């Protein structure tokens, strides 16, 4: 795959990725090269790859528990799934992407980087995808759609007590208020906004967290990973 030069990893990257820092750096070069070449990333994003994209996704790993199965819906160039897999090698990430060229990029990328992820081509709402993936502990997404649509796609992939993590922007609180009722109707409740990685990225990653089914209270108390 084509590589391109990127700014050196910031100091925070070593703290977030640890021994996987070199793989994270390789992923950044792939995004800047093949990712831009194939239209998965805008060329203007290369200079801010680390803070805006890679680290912003990776810090969400603090909301994961060891051994969890994590589905990334609408994975695109692998964000947030690949940074999460690098930062949290103790979880298993499934990258779900409907477009052929993007799913091929994902397969080539994880093979070159050398990480244990699965790639499933299809839409999260497709029955074939649901049958292949089964139920997961966490469904994560980034800049894919509005919360009501994300809930409709995420909920069938979540086990009872599982969590939906939607990486959002500064209007996340307003969006939660707008869609809370629709999310509850689909079985996702106790919706809240978390800020992650404030010690590593500025601004912190903003994540909408929702819980699936009746086991949500006990899950919410143990869901955050302690560093």
UniProtKB/Swiss-Prot annotation:
GO cellular component: cytosol
Entry's EC annotation: 2.1.1.-
Positions with a binding annotation for S-adenosyl-L-methionine: 74, 79, 124-125, 142
Listed GO MF terms: rRNA (guanine-N7-)-methyltransferase activity
Pfam families registered for this protein in UniProt: GidB
Top-level enzyme category: transferase
UniProt cross-references to SUPFAM superfamilies, sorted A to Z: S-adenosyl-L-methionine-dependent methyltransferases
Keyword field: Cytoplasm, Methyltransferase, rRNA processing, S-adenosyl-L-methionine, Transferase
UniProt entry tagged with the keyword rRNA-binding: no
Cellular compartment(s): Cytoplasm
PANTHER family: S-ADENOSYL-L-METHIONINE-DEPENDENT METHYLTRANSFERASES SUPERFAMILY PROTEIN
Family, similarity comment: Belongs to the methyltransferase superfamily. RNA methyltransferase RsmG family.
Function noted in UniProt: Specifically methylates the N7 position of guanine in position 518 of 16S rRNA.
UniProt-listed HAMAP family: 16SrRNA_methyltr_G
Name the UniProt record assigns to this protein: Ribosomal RNA small subunit methyltransferase G
Gene of this entry: rsmG
